[in-house]
């Protein structure tokens, strides 16, 4: 997996103070997407064990309380990203108790395959659906267009 940007302290992409990771790779290529640079799987930089360790350390840093992590992109549920996203989410569950996990994807919940559902079964919130320019609404919270759904899973 590759990623474009990591924010160790973020107050924009989800509730509270959190970490945010923007991964590479998106098959949806939504017109009007604000993050087109993340579409190509080979763009950005490699997601390494060192980066994963940094995320875990940041989530556990007691100097800045973080509510959790937001995973966006690109698309964290792109089939080629799922193995690394699953490993990261499993590690967060094991090593960062009480942290919530939000995932943004262009897939709808009812379109997800078994591998993608392994990730979804471990997260707190899934924001699903492609961004649709004609349905864009800046007043929406945590989503860009009105067709997207915020699923509070646990």
Curated annotation (Swiss-Prot):
The record's EC number reads: 1.97.1.-
- Reactions catalysed according to its record: glycyl-[protein] + reduced [flavodoxin] + S-adenosyl-L-methionine = glycin-2-yl radical-[protein] + semiquinone [flavodoxin] + 5'-deoxyadenosine + L-methionine + H(+)
Any GO CC annotation of this UniProt entry: cytoplasm
Gene3D superfamilies in the record: Aldolase class I
Going by the UniProt record, its keywords in alphabetical order are: 4Fe-4S, Cytoplasm, Iron, Iron-sulfur, Metal-binding, Oxidoreductase, S-adenosyl-L-methionine
Molecular function, one GO term: 4 iron, 4 sulfur cluster binding
- Tell me which PROSITE patterns the record gives: RADICAL_ACTIVATING
Residues binding [4Fe-4S] cluster = 26, 30, 33
Main subcellular location: cytoplasm
Q: Which Pfam families does the record cross-reference, listed alphabetically?
A: Fer4_12
What does the cofactor field's note say? Binds 1 [4Fe-4S] cluster. The cluster is coordinated with 3 cysteines and an exchangeable S-adenosyl-L-methionine.
Q: Which cofactor does it need?
A: [4Fe-4S] cluster
InterPro entries membership: Aldolase_TIM (IPR013785), NrdG (IPR012837), Organic_radical-activating (IPR034457), Radical_activat_CS (IPR001989)
- Write out the annotated subcellular location: Cytoplasm
Top-level enzyme category: oxidoreductase
Question: Where are the coiled-coil regions?
Answer: none
Which residues participate in S-adenosyl-L-methionine binding? 32-34, 74
Which CDD domains would you find in this protein's record?
A: Radical_SAM (cd01335)
The UniProt similarity line reads: Belongs to the organic radical-activating enzymes family.
What does the subunit section of this Swiss-Prot or TrEMBL entry state?
Forms a tetramer composed of two NrdD and two NrdG subunits.
Described by its record, this protein's role is as follows: Activation of anaerobic ribonucleoside-triphosphate reductase under anaerobic conditions by generation of an organic free radical, using S-adenosylmethionine and reduced flavodoxin as cosubstrates to produce 5'-deoxy-adenosine.
Q: What is this protein called?
A: Anaerobic ribonucleoside-triphosphate reductase-activating protein
- What organism does the record attribute this protein to? Salmonella typhi
């Amino acid at each position: 997996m590759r990623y474009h940007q990591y924010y160790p302290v973020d107050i924009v992409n989800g509730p509270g103070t959190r970490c945010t990771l923007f991964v590479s790779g998106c098959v949806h290529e939504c017109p009007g997407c604000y993050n087109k640079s993340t579409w190509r799987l080979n763009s950005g930089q490699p997601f390494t064990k060192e980066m994963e360790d940094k995320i875990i350390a940041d989530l556990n840093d007691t100097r800045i309380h973080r509510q959790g992590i937001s995973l966006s992109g690109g698309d964290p549920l792109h089939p080629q990203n799922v193995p690394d996203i699953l490993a990261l989410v499993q590690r967060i569950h094991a090593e960062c108790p009480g942290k919530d996990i939000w995932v943004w994807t262009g897939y709808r919940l009812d379109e997800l395959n078994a591998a993608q559902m392994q990730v979804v079964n471990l997260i707190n919130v899934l924001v699903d659906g492609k961004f649709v320019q004609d349905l864009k609404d800046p007043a929406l919270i945590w989503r860009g267009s009105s067709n997207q759904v915020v699923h509070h899973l646990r």
